[in-house]
Structure formats: C-alpha cells, structure tokens
Amino acid sequence: MASLRDIKAKINSTKKTSQITKAMEMVSASKLNRAEQNAKSFVPYMEKIQEVVASIAQGSKGINHPMLTARPVKRTGYIVITSDRGLAGGYNSNVLREVSKVIRERHNMDPNQYSIIVLGRLGRDYLKRRGFNIIDEVVGLSDHPSFTDIKDLASRAIAMFADGAYDELYIYYNHYVSKISQEVTENKVLPLTDVKSDKKLTPYEFEPSEEEILKVLLPQYAESLVYGALLDGKASEHAARMTAMKSATDNAMEVIDTLTLSFNRARQAAITQEITEIVGGAAALE
C-alpha cells in the first residue's frame, strides 16, 4: 500500500493538473465564443456571393468557364484543415483518419493520382510521417484567422486547378455542429458544377458582361469556400479542446476524490495501529 506521503503528493499533483486543465477549458470557451461569431458573420457574404454566382450559372446559357466545367479526372487535390496544437480530443485524428482512408481507397496511395494541401502542424507531421504526397502547407495560423491569412494559399490552390495540376479539389475539415459535436466534412471546391442558392434568385443586370464578372467572382467564391471551412474548423477546434479539457478536469476531480478516500483510510489505519501498539505496550507493563 502507498504511504500517506505518497498519496498526499499524488493528490497535490492532481490538483495542480486540474487547475491547468480548468484554465485551458476557460480559455478555449472564450476563444470558441469569438470563433462562433466569426463563422456566423461570414455567412451573409457567402450566401450573397453564392446567390450571384448561381444567378449567372443557372440563368444564362452559353456561359463557359473552366471553373464551372467538369473534366476527366486524372488527379485529385485535397485541402486538409487541422490544428497546430493538440489536447483537442479527436479533432485532428478524426479528419486525418478519414482523409487517409479516402486516399487509400480512391488512389491506392499513388502520388500521381492525388496531392494534398494541409493546414496545421499536426496534420502536416502526421501525413508526412506516413508518406502522403503533400505539395503545400500552412502552419502557425491565428486562432481567429483573417481572410488575408488564407488568401495566398487559396489562390495557389485555385491556380493549380486552372493550370491542370489536378482536375478536382476537395476540402476536409471538422464542421461545427455544437459545443459537444463536430462532424468530419468533405466539400467539393472545384469545379463548381453544382452552385445553387437556397434563396429565390434575384435577376441581375451585369456590366460589362457575365463572362467578365465570372472571371473575377468565381475565384473569390472558391476562396471564400476555403475561408469559410477554415472558420468552421477553428470553431470546431476550440469546442473540441474545451470539451477535452472539461473531461480532463472532471477526471482529475474523480481521481482526487478516490485518492482522498484512500488517504483517509490509510490515515485511519495508521492511527488504529498506533492505538493498538500503545494499548499493547501499556498492558505489557502491568
């Protein structure tokens, strides 16, 4: 049986750990509130640009743009959103497991058939160690990234599609459902063959022309899909970390309760032993 000193040291150590996890939980909760606001505030822009693109794509005939046209798929691009830091439960492992499975099933790990653009240090390290074909990466993103932080990467990804580096582009990330639920999600970014708006389409008059508008608007729309997924993923990351730290704190409190019970029992046993020895010694002197 562990000594009273050992049990007491374990209790103190666990208390200190619980203080750390509680602080991390509170920090993550604060970051989550802001991340939720960022994601929600981006929705109106996404909906409006989607409405305009859908109005052109569905309301006009003869519109021909490479980003709207499907072509034979010889190579597929993947954007994978992960985090730079751990302690977030299954946030990273879930999306990386899904991406790994998809690439093995679709491409049999043939680097000539796929390429990966990865966001986040943990995702980069995981995929590199396992020999996946990474062609671009971004690490060190802010907890609350701006569009500027991701624009260069998104522009490169779109340019590679236009140049034929791959024939379709998907993005994988954790979609934020609630504080306790996040879902691994696959969205097709390019080509934009299924652009639809949930709202009733408003008729627009375009100047100088629909084709010229699309040249500017389609890359912006594709970039906004990437940025929207990043904001969604950041909210999921903070929610997952908050939940993980709450679970760790709760587990620590259970351990403390168990250790305290063991400490009290050991202390009671020690006192009983001392009393027995004193009584026995007194009886021997009589």
Swiss-Prot record:
PANTHER family: ATP SYNTHASE GAMMA CHAIN, ATP SYNTHASE SUBUNIT GAMMA, MITOCHONDRIAL. Belongs to the ATPase gamma chain family. The keyword Cell membrane applies. This is ATP synthase gamma chain. Produces ATP from ADP in the presence of a proton gradient across the membrane. The gamma chain is believed to be important in regulating ATPase activity and the flow of protons through the CF(0) complex. It comes from Bacillus cytotoxicus (strain DSM 22905 / CIP 110041 / 391-98 / NVH 391-98). GO terms for cellular component: plasma membrane; proton-transporting ATP synthase complex. F-type ATPases have 2 components, CF(1) - the catalytic core - and CF(0) - the membrane proton channel. CF(1) has five subunits: alpha(3), beta(3), gamma(1), delta(1), epsilon(1). CF(0) has three main subunits: a, b and c. It is found in: Cell membrane. GO terms for biological process: proton motive force-driven plasma membrane ATP synthesis. The gene is atpG. The lineage of its organism: Bacteria, Bacillati, Bacillota, Bacilli, Bacillales. Its main location: membrane.
